[in-house]
Amino acid sequence: MKVVILGYGSIGKRHAQNLKKLGHEVIPLDLNYKLRFDVDCAFICTPTQFHVNHATEYIERGIPVFIEKPLTYNMEELEKIESLVKKQPVISMVGCNLRFHPSLLKAKIIASTRRVIYARAETGYYLPFWRQEDYRKSYSASEYGGIVLDAIHEPDYLYWLFGDIKDLKMVCDKVSNLEIKKEDIAEIGIIFESGLSASVHCDYLMKNYHRKLDLYMPHEVISFKIQPTNIMYKKEVQYFLDCVKERKEPMNNIKEAGYVLSKILEGSGYNPSKAYINQTAPEDIKEDR
């Protein structure tokens, strides 16, 4: 297949490398390049605030789109793209690479076959270590970023494991002196329609990479460490391209991803327009210099 990748940052380059290894023709485009439409599908890997506009260009032409997470950053943009795909259906998928992680595939089997009574997801990594070039110039640090949208993988895979969400509440804040405009720490509580409850912790503060899922059962707790691996990205890309080839609707299409995102954007305790400008942390919790 011929695939255009719009946005050639770290995730765009990763997708390009994986696509080439899978034998596909890749056309990488940065923001200042003219869009190409002579392709079989498009990967939208630009900063979050451009996702909807760039995806729209391809959707209106009936070209399948893969959009990196998060789908967008506010309800207005979300409603715009949801309205578009209702009028003009197209094969679409939003990034959900953790659904392809070996540890979470095992968790999926357990969640489907055993009685889970509670779930706890955690993720954290110090932002300057995560965004290694200059974190202050990354989308994470911008008004369109923040740890809640950066860590949308956790609510997404919990939804994938346990189904529709009845209620979602959160507490989020900026507690460090990282030079960012949004929250750097959050606690999210979720109640599913099944009655199961779960919680998520996410932050930009942990100096060592940390990501795990704990599934509580009546007589034991099973923990899943979620270590970085390229395997999940390759499987994600192959899955999407198989759907394009077979003209099959992928999981986590725009409608499904929009459902989870809307729960977060509308969740009690989260204000997507709030910026933590010029806030600094107390001296005793500032990070090491």
Where are these regions (language model features)?
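C-terminal helix-rich "cap/oligomerization" subdomain common to oxidoreductases
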Residues: 20, 32, 41-46, 193, ...
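Rossmann-fold dehydrogenase core element
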Residues: 80-97, 115-119
